[in-house]
From Swiss-Prot:
Keyword annotations: Metal-binding, mRNA processing, mRNA splicing, Nucleus, Spliceosome, Zinc, Zinc-finger
Keyword Plastid: no
Quaternary assembly: Component of the U11/U12 snRNPs that are part of the U12-type spliceosome.
GO terms of molecular function: zinc ion binding
Taxonomic path: Eukaryota, Metazoa, Chordata, Craniata, Vertebrata
GO biological process: mRNA processing; RNA splicing
Residue stretches spanning the membrane: none
Region annotation (Disordered) ranges: 83-111
Species in which this protein is naturally found: Danio rerio (Zebrafish)
Official protein name in the record: Zinc finger matrin-type protein 5
Gene: zmat5
PANTHER family linked: NUCLEASE-RELATED, ZINC FINGER MATRIN-TYPE PROTEIN 5
Amino acid sequence: MGKRYYCDYCDRSFQDNLHNRKKHLNGVQHHRAKKAWFDNFRDAATLLNDERSKEVCRKFVQTGQCVFGTSCRFSHMSEKQMKMLEQKIDDEKRQKEDPDQDGSSERSVDEWLSRREKKLAALTSGRVLRMEEEECTENIEIPPYLLSIPDLPPSLHPPPAGGWRVTVHNEWG
């Protein structure tokens, strides 16, 4: 049995030789799967421009489905969906123009440096526990979309209300 070629776009494998690979890469199924893959990464502005340039799909409007699916040359987006997409684009533009406008939870470098200096000073003077208590009481903002993910790994769960218990192990083994 020879080597096998696996196509990530189509999720299938076949014997790897020049004829089979060329036949697959030029096939309609591969082109559709590849287009669908790259369409997942298109930004909202290009998606909106493409949908606006298309006419509305009458079959989709009448029945709620279209036999051509994503390869249909007509638009399947409603006016409401287009408005939501426009709003998303406007929000992204505002975010790029002024990222500090909405009071993002990201800290500046100066804040980080001042906190680092406080920690180092606390370590030298022995006030480590008090500093950790102050950090736990800070207001931690968790993005709402993060909590909506069903199987979130434990490392991404928000910290408990009282903070984690700190245990100091002086001995190894």
